[in-house]
């Protein structure tokens, strides 16, 4: 009897649970209907958008062409971002519109011709014959003439040069300093003189080439001739020019010019400056005096 009563109790509970389980399913079905309606509305909107945009362009991205690629899921997810992207449509106005510029280019200030007449009544033609505009620093006519002469390289043309004179120079040191600075700037900007050799001479770049290893090895054993050698100045010039592969003739002026030009190039070279600063001076040990005499070298730059 106890078993039958328990079975009946379980059957009653099952019958009570059935309607309670059916009710949420009905609620879900109603929500699903709403979702279906929303999805149908969005689909219709998408169709309208597709109709507005028209047919896909030729050569456009098609996801179906890349579905068969053997790639990982992360790469496939990256490909999905291409279809998710929607570019913004910006309408550009290409109409030409006339406008008045804010600024009008002009040389100096616009002359309003509002001049104060001279006390004697004579016309000064200011603004007509003489330029009338403000300037913080006027050019010196003498310095300007020197600049033009230097740039044109017309030094042999006879012309009337303006000589600047300064009254009461002791009371005007600023004008003297300005003149010195102007002439110094002129000399600093002066291009190097062009020299044409009458005899065949090698190029500076050729003379700056590295010596052969045999010659450098020889310089490590035999030092270069110094000024203490017993010879004349002409013979010493011939020896130095011969070591540096500079040809010399009866007149050694051109050879000396090329020699000092080579010296100037080495002195102003950034490469050799860095080598000279980074090179350590070798100090031989005190017990090897003979070895130090053999290894004595002289760097000629």
From Swiss-Prot:
Region Disordered, residue ranges = 1-66
Upon gene disruption, the observed phenotype is:
Short cilia.
Key word Hydrolase present: no
Q: Pfam families per the record?
A: IFT46_B_C
One Gene Ontology cellular component? intraciliary transport particle B
Provide this UniProt record's keywords sorted from A to Z: Cell projection, Cilium, Cytoplasm, Cytoskeleton, Phosphoprotein
Residues annotated as carrying Phosphothreonine in the record are 283
Q: Where in the cell is it found?
A: Cytoplasm, Cytoskeleton, Cilium basal body; Cell projection, Cilium
Q: Which tissues does the record link to its expression?
A: Strongly expressed in ovary and testis, moderately expressed in kidney and brain, and weakly expressed in thymus, heart, lung, liver, spleen and muscle. Expressed in embryonic bone and cartilage, with high expression in non-hypertrophic chondrocytes and weaker expression in hypertrophic chondrocytes.
Q: Which GO terms describe its biological process?
A: axoneme assembly; cilium assembly; cilium organization; cilium-dependent cell motility; intraciliary anterograde transport; intraciliary transport; protein transport; regulation of cilium assembly
Which InterPro entries does this UniProt record tie to the protein?
Intraflagellar_transp_cmplxB
**Phosphoprotein: present as a keyword of the record?**
yes
Instruction: List the induction conditions.
Output: By BMP2.
Q: Where is the composition biased (Acidic residues)?
A: 1-12, 30-52
User: Would you identify the family this protein belongs to, as annotated?
Assistant: Belongs to the IFT46 family.
Give the protein's biological function. Answer: Forms part of a complex involved in intraflagellar transport (IFT), the bi-directional movement of particles required for the assembly, maintenance and functioning of primary cilia. May play a role in chondrocyte maturation and skeletogenesis.
User: How is this protein organized at the quaternary level?
Assistant: Component of the IFT complex B, at least composed of IFT20, IFT22, IFT25, IFT27, IFT46, IFT52, TRAF3IP1/IFT54, IFT57, IFT74, IFT80, IFT81, and IFT88. Interacts with IFT57, IFT88 and DAW1. Interacts with ARL13B. Interacts with IFT56. Interacts with TTC25. Interacts with IFT70B.
What is the name of this protein? Answer: Intraflagellar transport protein 46 homolog
Organism of provenance = Mus musculus (Mouse)
